[in-house]
């Protein structure tokens, strides 16, 4: 059942009705010596801390996997308001809001979602969501081909390898190519990326933080791309945008990413949602649906699906994409998540993620034979070099109920000993110390 506390005004009104001057008067008949002096209650807890305790009691010792895995999908807190509001019948539907006269609530929610994404990314226009982060990167690549009328995309190899596969798949069959540029250690090779841009380049695609967890400034790369008439596409991790410079601040033309970390739980790969935002001058090349604000014939504010001539149900052969459904419910969860935290709360969440990952980075890299591979700033994720292959080490720790990270040898040849570890705000110091102890034991055996 719901719990709605009484406001001070409501309390005063109720006391006045029963003729009492204060709440204390209600307990006056109870002798003072019989009244409880203290209830011996622990200090107040956050919603997440209380949920953790209740889950521990419910599990009664049952084993659960402790995740230190990232690679694009992350284990973050989800305020109870997200589940409660997104499950309301008004929102919980697969219906596409083509009829604005009976869809104002849904349309306004999606309009506010677009506003939140623009504020996060530093961009001017957003659509109403895409399938996931990978398809968002690929749609941005196609968008750059349309805008520049060129046929070459440069892909930084420190972009999520699964997302790079999707880009390659999207470009297959088109008269376009994706050229990969190898990273410099665990960071983007900015010099090589700049040197790869030519008159046939439609866009340069980078990720910040990248797949190794490294954070970089791409402002100079944006200038180099623009000098050659190319675009800069930045794939971002939304939680990191509470601390790091937004794609817009770096001069990017298109910002994309996976919105899973905004109020959507880990769920065997989905459903999640992808976000895409761009400069206003590129709005007619944005894929998917866009919700706009307008005025009806009676002067009332209303919301509608706008610029629909870009979409396949109007001009299929000229459509910017063939997205037959989007992830509106997941995007709504993202909006509620952002609204629940607010600007200050979002910044505090990002800082908490950064601090906990910094502790884990220091703790794990101090183990014998373990070295940190990231040269500069990291966020959430960081990459360790182990004294042995990472895959069997991860397998061993999994038997103890700990998913230690992502072995990078499966994606990058020659990096068999590299392990990408992720630490979010949900991981406690005790859990990080447990990972360190188990990792140390596995490396010594």
Swiss-Prot record:
Reactions listed under catalytic activity: N(6)-[(R)-lipoyl]-L-lysyl-[glycine-cleavage complex H protein] + glycine + H(+) = N(6)-[(R)-S(8)-aminomethyldihydrolipoyl]-L-lysyl-[glycine-cleavage complex H protein] + CO2
What Pfam families does the record tag this protein with?
GDC-P
Gene3D superfamilies given in the database record: Aspartate Aminotransferase, domain 1, Type I PLP-dependent aspartate aminotransferase-like (Major domain)
GO biological process terms held by the UniProt record: glycine decarboxylation via glycine cleavage system; nucleoside metabolic process
Q: What is its EC number?
A: 1.4.4.2
GO molecular function terms noted in the UniProt entry: glycine dehydrogenase (decarboxylating) activity
Q: Which UniProt keywords apply?
A: Oxidoreductase
Q: What does this protein do?
A: The glycine cleavage system catalyzes the degradation of glycine. The P protein binds the alpha-amino group of glycine through its pyridoxal phosphate cofactor; CO(2) is released and the remaining methylamine moiety is then transferred to the lipoamide cofactor of the H protein.
Q: How does it assemble?
A: The glycine cleavage system is composed of four proteins: P, T, L and H. In this organism, the P 'protein' is a heterodimer of two subunits.
Q: Which family does it belong to?
A: Belongs to the GcvP family. N-terminal subunit subfamily.
* Official protein name in the record: Probable glycine dehydrogenase (decarboxylating) subunit 1
Q: Which organism is it from?
A: Geobacter sp. (strain M21)
| Species classification | Bacteria, Pseudomonadati, Thermodesulfobacteriota, Desulfuromonadia, Geobacterales
